[in-house]
């Protein structure tokens, strides 16, 4: 929670669930410009689930964690529309600084017991560490590769080999840069059986690695695909050998494996892989750009006793924000 005297009078509460949101502000942090209208939908959805999660667990005796493995600076630079009839000012596009996932999570009430952020860039790490000046919460910041840092966190006390391990519960937000989340990391999180994972699966980035012909996939792309899917079965599923045809001179030509899988089939394979390690895989919240599926936001959990409750919160979020995603993605 923000320290006394630092709470903005402009904060508002979502009319449905009471999610606090930080509006447009100015900041001295390094610029972190990314995303578009779909980014706010993603952050709104995550924020709403965090509120639901904290309400559900607030009297259960657990220590709750918000874990953001690609936390950025805590805020983002964006262009927003200002003015209009109700403001009696001309409509114009202005640059603003909006709360990112870290600041939104820090504004959830009741607060999490611990906030854990990781980043690789020193300037972003410094910006995250500066959040301690504005919030009373226990904020832990780690610099390094997100996959490595998550392995350290969940293989160490209090998550492992500690008398209070049973008390630990977390929401883990994976909003990676490209295809940087390894399947081994998802497996590690599933094995805890105590975390809810929100994973922004980079559907478009994966498809871009899949050349039309299997021969067009170089070693680096193949390694990236093996890493994100946790197997090499994808090639057999996505590519089919075409019948060999003779050349103009009658010489035989070796068959060529051609990609036959559609974007929907590739996404279905990803869900199948998630389902192999998590007991619960939500329907995705599609995040579209110009009407095309670029990302899919999933909730994953391997905590069977809590799945009915998790499912109730997730289904509300997906149902609420899917129409908004389609509206804002129009070209």
Report the location of each language-model feature.
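SAM cofactor-binding core of SAM-dependent methyltransferases
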Residues: 44-152
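A conserved mid-domain beta-alpha-beta active-site/ligand-binding segment of alpha/beta enzyme cores
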Residues: 213-281
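Conserved beta-strand signature within the Rossmann-like core of class I S-adenosyl-L-methionine
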Residues: 193-205
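A short, conserved alpha-helix within the catalytic core of class I
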Residues: 179-188
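A short SAM/SAH-binding and catalytic strip from SAM-dependent methyltransferases
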Residues: 170-180
């Amino acid at each position: 929670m923000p320290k006394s005297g630092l709470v903005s009078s402009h904060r508002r509460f979502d009319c449905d669930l009471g999610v606090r949101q930080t509006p447009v502000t100015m900041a001295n942090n390094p610029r972190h410009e990314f995303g578009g209208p779909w980014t706010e939908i993603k952050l709104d959805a995550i924020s709403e689930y965090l509120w639901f999660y904290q309400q559900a667990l607030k009297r259960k005796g657990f220590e709750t964690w918000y874990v953001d493995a690609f936390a950025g600076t805590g805020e983002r630079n964006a262009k927003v529309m200002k003015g209009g009839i109700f403001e009696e000012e001309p409509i114009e596009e202005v640059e603003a600084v909006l709360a990112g996932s870290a600041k939104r999570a820090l504004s959830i009430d009741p607060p999490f017991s611990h906030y854990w952020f990781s980043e690789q860039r020193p300037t972003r790490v410094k910006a995250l560490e500066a959040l301690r000046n504005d919030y009373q919460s226990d904020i832990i910041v780690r610099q390094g590769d997100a996959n490595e840092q998550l392995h350290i966190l969940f293989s160490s006390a209090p998550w492992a080999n500690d008398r209070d391990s049973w008390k630990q519960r977390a929401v883990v937000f994976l909003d990676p840069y490209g295809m940087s989340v390894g399947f081994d990391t998802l497996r590690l999180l599933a094995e805890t059986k105590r975390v809810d994972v929100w994973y922004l699966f980079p559907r478009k980035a994966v498809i871009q690695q899949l050349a039309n012909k299997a021969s067009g996939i170089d070693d680096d792309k193949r390694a990236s695909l093996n890493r994100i899917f946790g197997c090499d079965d994808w090639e057999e599923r996505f590519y089919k050998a075409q019948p060999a045809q003779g050349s103009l001179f009658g010489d035989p030509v070796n068959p060529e494996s051609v990609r036959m899988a559609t974007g929907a089939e590739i996404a279905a394979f990803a869900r199948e892989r998630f389902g192999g390690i998590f007991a619960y895989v939500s329907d995705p919240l599609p995040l579209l750009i110009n009407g095309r599926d670029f990302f899919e936001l999933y909730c994953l959990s391997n905590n069977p006793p809590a799945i009915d409750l998790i499912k109730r919160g997730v289904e509300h979020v997906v149902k609420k924000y899917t129409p908004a995603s389609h509206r804002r993605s129009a070209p």
